[in-house]
Structure formats: structure tokens, C-alpha cells
């Protein structure tokens, strides 16, 4: 794959101010392709469905994923690009980090201004205690 692409993965609705905050126009002006991958419907379906609709970015750069298989297929096809993950690591997002790790995808990780999450939910505490973060991600 010869094109330069930055793939931004978000877990909440992507608004017009997010478009500016991420500097999407700057990337485009420098010749980068941009994909905004929204995994909100998979990770936080109720939050995504009920979130404010006003000022959402609805442009062609955004791909909204409703199924894990769609996301996995997308990641496989685009694994040579640079990924910016703007999602928490928790029980709901574990599968994304696992796929990224297995595909040896290069990525940056940011947790600035993302949807808060509580990884201390009782039924998931055992998973949290079982997992060793260093073995999941190869840094």
C-alpha cells in the first residue's frame, strides 16, 4: 500500500469540533489520507445511539462500525497505515487491542478527551486481574 493514511479510531460520536481538534485539514493539506473509524456502536451502543446529534461530523472520512467482524476486516486491509487510538483500554475494547497486536499494527495511543469508562465493573474484575497488559500489547 503506497498511500499515506492516518486512521483515527474513536469510541464516541465524532463532532465537527473533533474534526478541528484532530487537525484533519492539516493532515489532508500535507497529502495524507484520513479515515475516522468510529467503534462507538460496538463499544458503547446506548451512549452512541442517545448522544447529541447536533454538530456531528457526517462526512465521507468517517466509517462507523456496527460489527466486530467489519472492524477486523478493515484493520486487516489497512494494517500498514498509522493508527491513532483515541479509546480506553478496558473489557469492551480489549478485542481491538488484541487484533492490533496480532496484526503488528503501528499505533499511537491517546486518552485525552475520550469517553470515561469504569473498568472496575464487578463481572469484569476477574478479566482485569487475569490480563497482563504487557503481554497484550507489544510496545
Please annotate each region the language model reported.
Residues 7-30, 37-139:
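Active-site and donor-binding regions of nucleotide-sugar-utilizing enzymes
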Residues 3:
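Phosphate-coordination loops involved in phosphoryl transfer and adenosine-cofactor binding
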